[in-house]
């Protein structure tokens, strides 16, 4: 085709003759194609490209791309054709002008066939055919590389062409000779179009394959990460760290060996063998290090061929010195943990040998240590849990008994006003007058002073020490009781009550701290009940003694109770943790020797305390008070405050403080002092019932039971007092107030008594638990003050029935508060609770709760 350009440009007049012949044949071929294939011309301005490549725009009909057009209507299709050709990738084009088109003259049939189109073409007479020399020169030009230029011009001509053809549906049948002439061109076009469609489909499939591949790789990486994370918490690994901690001489050595151990565990997930899921792994017999390492991987990991099935990673072979079966070890570990935490098995247990004889070794010490992971990822080791030392129960019982005597004094002081106010307001016994308003202050000033004592107790236990702070409350307790016993006016009574309340606030904060830092975890559950039990004993003792003594003699008894408490406090040491916090390592060692036994190896536990204190010092610079006001912390703080509010405004302290007066006003046929004793006994035993049921029924179930019981009893009590004042005679129902009070105390002790304090430690975030607990405790004391101070005013203004109905209505609102806002925390870890409450978690993992590793990859 480019040869024609050369001839037309440089041939002069004679050179135009072959070009005219070629153009004539081209027009003739165009006419023949249009007739035989059933196409008609839409545009009259045919592009006369020398290469004639525009004829490639004669597209066969495709039902998926072009609509059917009837013979009568032939709309222009130039825009759609041009856009279609521009969007498609460039294809290879070939000229339609063949050698036989040049050498073969047109037939008369072809010359007579007109081109059916909207615009006619004027056909010129056919020129003579080209000579053989011109044909040879044309072929030489094609061989010298003119095809590339022709192809480029063909593409440009194709893009700029505005010629479009539509299929004309005619009934005329074409001759077999015309079909044979055009079959090669049509087949070539169909082949190119099919190839293009295949190429496009392949491109789409390629993108989908890449997307699926990325998804598969992402899932595989996620499974590997989860596997590594779970492997690091394996029980066998924890036991290794336990032995490692005892053998390490420094913190750096422990961390170094720990990293090496974790590296060994993570090698079981080496990517070199992770994807070889289609091979059966067997040990290697070669001596090279690399093959030996691979054999070790294969020996440690047992993977199924299907990666969707659960993968069990057995780490029992990580410790070369341990050849105990993993399942047996796991069962043994669970038994040890159950024994150490079950209060019903608190008696001394012994291991049995194969013959069933006692070995004489206490196995409760086998509980692993609690490992806390701080926010920066470093391990925080609390008081060293595992020890081979026997548990010297008597020394720790002595320490717990000493501080629990302080709790007995607290209970006695709290219940003092209930039996004492009856005789104190009697002018035949008291030399000074105690008005109703003064009596309300006698009962209400103690919780107000307890609020101040709780705030002051926090700094005191840090500066003076836990033991010294508790010891410092003994003498003020004695002085406060003597002030009340020797009082000659109401002011002395109020001063004594205020001083006693201040000591109560300090003791309520420092007693549990001392027990938590001195008693071993194996007996902490049992000994931790002593303060609560002794507090209830103090309340019962006050009720019993108050039935036989007046307010002055009862105060003298209260002054005598702190004396054994004071003596025993001199016998016990300060907590080792406080000594470590002050840098007194030697004194901490002596304290541990006293608590654990002279022959005990206390060095590992002492090192654990020092590490824990170092971590606490790093966190001490953070201002946690500002964290209380963040939005994410307001929900758990509000729930704790709400529980404390409904606990106190259920009227419990009003009932405890004014039990005798309430029974006198009720006109019960049972002696009022006997009624208070019965209430004290019920309160004592109901506390232990709540402890037994709280982990079996759940927190919310017990809160429901407690709230419903208090609502019913308070409503019945209100109705009883209303009928007594305004309605029919109820003297024959003298047993009803005592029955209601017993059920009321029982319901309170099951739920709203212990659970608000328990849930305060569960739902408050770890980062703000200290300051938040102080705020909640102070709020509890404030509510106690309001209830006890205003109870007599309420009964005077609304009547006893109005006060009890008010408390019942508050309990009714509290029931809906529990249903809507209070979460269930039974069986959940602190991480799960914090994640649910705040949406984030601070990792605090106890390996005692870890189950054998089995997870899905």
UniProtKB/Swiss-Prot annotation:
Protein's name according to its UniProt entry: Facilitated trehalose transporter Tret1-1
Region (Disordered): 1-28, 62-203, 327-346
Molecular functions (GO terms): D-glucose transmembrane transporter activity; trehalose transmembrane transporter activity
Main location: membrane
Residues with the Phosphoserine modification: 248-250, 320, 322, 845-846
Extracellular-side segments: 414-440, 495-497, 550-552, 658-673, 722-740, 792-801
Record-linked PROSITE patterns: MFS, SUGAR_TRANSPORT_1, SUGAR_TRANSPORT_2
Glycosylated residue positions: 428, 550
CDD domains: MFS_GLUT6_8_Class3_like
Location(s) in or outside the cell: Cell membrane
Membrane-spanning ranges: 393-413, 441-461, 474-494, 498-518, 529-549, 553-573, 637-657, 674-694, 701-721, 741-761, 771-791, 802-822
Keyword list, A-Z: Cell membrane, Glycoprotein, Membrane, Phosphoprotein, Sugar transport, Transmembrane, Transmembrane helix, Transport
Entry keyword annotation includes S-adenosyl-L-methionine: no
Composition bias type Polar residues, residue spans: 69-81, 171-181, 330-341
Compositional bias per record (Basic and acidic residues), positions renumbered to this chain: 134-143
GO biological process, any: D-glucose transmembrane transport
Record's keyword annotation contains Transport: yes
Function: Low-capacity facilitative transporter for trehalose. Does not transport maltose, sucrose or lactose. Mediates the bidirectional transfer of trehalose. Responsible for the transport of trehalose synthesized in the fat body and the incorporation of trehalose into other tissues that require a carbon source, thereby regulating trehalose levels in the hemolymph.
Membrane-side (Cytoplasmic) residue stretches: 1-392, 462-473, 519-528, 574-636, 695-700, 762-770, 823-857
GO-annotated cellular components: plasma membrane
Source organism: Drosophila simulans
Family per similarity comment: Belongs to the major facilitator superfamily. Sugar transporter (TC 2.A.1.1) family. Trehalose transporter subfamily.
Lipid bilayer topology: Multi-pass membrane protein
Pfam families referenced in this protein's UniProt entry, alphabetically: Sugar_tr
């Amino acid at each position: 085709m480019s040869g024609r350009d050369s001839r037309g440009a440089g041939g002069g007049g004679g050179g135009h003759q072959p070009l005219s012949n070629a153009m004539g044949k081209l027009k003739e071929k165009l006419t023949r194609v249009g007739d035989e294939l059933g196409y008609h011309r839409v545009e009259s301005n045919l592009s006369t490209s020398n290469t004639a490549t525009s004829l490639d725009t004669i597209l066969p009909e495709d039902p998926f791309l072009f609509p059917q057009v009837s013979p009568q209507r032939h709309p222009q299709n130039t825009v759609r054709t041009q856009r279609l050709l521009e969007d498609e990738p460039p294809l290879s084009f070939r000229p339609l002008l063949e050698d036989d088109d040049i050498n073969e003259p047109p037939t008369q049939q072809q010359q007579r066939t007109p081109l059916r189109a909207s615009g006619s073409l004027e056909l010129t007479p056919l020129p003579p055919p080209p000579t053989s020399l011109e044909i040879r020169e044309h072929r030489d030009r094609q061989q010298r590389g003119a095809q590339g230029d022709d192809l480029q011009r063909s593409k440009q001509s194709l893009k700029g062409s505005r010629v479009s053809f539509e299929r004309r549906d005619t009934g005329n049948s074409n001759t077999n000779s015309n079909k044979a002439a055009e079959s090669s061109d049509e087949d070539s076009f169909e082949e190119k179009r099919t190839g293009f469609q295949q190429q496009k489909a392949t491109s789409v499939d390629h993108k989908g394959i890449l997307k699926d591949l990325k998804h598969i790789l992402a899932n595989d990486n996620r499974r590997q990460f989860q596997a590594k994370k779970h492997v690091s918490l394996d029980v066998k690994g924890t036991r290794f760290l336990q032995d490692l901690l005892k053998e390490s001489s420094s913190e750096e050595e422990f961390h170094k060996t720990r990293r090496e151990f974790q590296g060994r565990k993570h090698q079981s997930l080496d990517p070199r063998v992770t994807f070889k899921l289609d091979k059966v792994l067997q040990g290697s017999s070669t001596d090279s290090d690399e093959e030996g390492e691979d054999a070790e991987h294969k020996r440690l990991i047992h993977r199924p061929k299907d990666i969707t099935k659960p993968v069990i990673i057995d780490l029992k072979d990580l410790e070369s010195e341990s050849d105990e079966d993993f399942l047996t070890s796991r069962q043994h570990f669970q038994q040890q943990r159950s024994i150490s935490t079950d209060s019903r098995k608190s008696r001394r247990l012994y291991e049995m040998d194969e013959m069933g004889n006692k070995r004489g070794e206490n196995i409760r010490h086998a509980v692993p240590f609690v490992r806390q992971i701080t926010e920066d990822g470093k391990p925080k080791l609390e008081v060293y849990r595992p020890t081979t030392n026997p548990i010297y129960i008597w020394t720790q019982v002595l320490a717990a008994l000493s501080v629990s005597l302080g709790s007995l004094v607290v209970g006695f002081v709290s219940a003092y006003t209930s039996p004492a106010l009856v005789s104190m307001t009697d002018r035949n016994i008291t030399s000074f007058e105690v008005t109703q308003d003064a009596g309300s202050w006698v009962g209400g000033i103690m919780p107000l002073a307890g609020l101040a004592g709780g705030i002051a107790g926090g700094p005191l236990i840090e500066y003076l020490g836990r033991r010294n702070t508790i010891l410092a409350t003994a003498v003020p307790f004695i002085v406060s009781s003597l002030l009340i016993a020797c009082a000659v006016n109401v002011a002395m009574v109020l001063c004594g009550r205020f001083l006693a309340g201040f000591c109560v606030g300090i003791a309520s904060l420092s007693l549990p701290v001392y027990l938590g830092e001195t008693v071993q975890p194996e007996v902490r559950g049992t000994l931790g009940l002593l303060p609560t039990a002794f507090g209830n004993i103090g309340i019962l003792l006050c009720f019993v003694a108050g039935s036989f003594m007046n307010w002055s003699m009862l105060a003298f008894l209260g002054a005598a109770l702190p004396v054994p408490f004071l003596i025993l406090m001199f016998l016990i040491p300060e907590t080792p943790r406080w000594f470590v916090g002050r840098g007194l390592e030697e004194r901490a060692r002596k304290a541990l020797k006293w608590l654990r036994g002279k022959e005990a190896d206390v060095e590992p536990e002492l090192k654990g305390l020092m590490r824990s204190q170092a971590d606490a010092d790093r966190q001490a610079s953070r201002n946690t008070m500002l964290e209380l006001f963040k939005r994410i912390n307001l929900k758990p703080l509000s729930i704790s405050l709400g529980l404390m509010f409904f606990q106190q405004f259920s009227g419990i302290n009003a009932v405890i403080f004014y039990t005798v007066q309430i029974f006198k006003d009720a006109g019960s046929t049972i002696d009022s002092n006997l009624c208070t004793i019965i209430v004290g006994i019920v309160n004592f035993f109901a506390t232990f019932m709540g402890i037994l049921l709280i982990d079996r029924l759940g927190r919310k179930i017990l809160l429901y039971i407690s709230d419903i019981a208090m609502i019913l009893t308070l409503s019945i009590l209100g109705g009883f007092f209303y009928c007594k004042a305004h309605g029919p005679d109820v003297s024959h129902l003298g047993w009803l107030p005592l029955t209601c009070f017993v059920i009321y105390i029982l319901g309170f002790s099951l739920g709203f008594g212990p659970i608000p304090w328990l849930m305060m430690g569960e739902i408050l975030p770890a980062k703000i638990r200290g300051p938040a607990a102080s705020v909640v405790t102070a709020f509890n004391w404030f509510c106690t003050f309001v209830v006890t101070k205003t109870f007599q005013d309420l009964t005077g203004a609304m009547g006893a029935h109005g006060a009890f109905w008010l408390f019942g209505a508050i309990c009714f609102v509290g029931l809906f508060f529990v249903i809507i806002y209070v979460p269930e925390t039974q069986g959940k870890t602190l991480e799960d609770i914090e994640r649910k409450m705040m949406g984030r978690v601070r990792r605090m993992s106890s390996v005692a709760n870890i189950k054998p590793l089995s997870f899905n990859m």
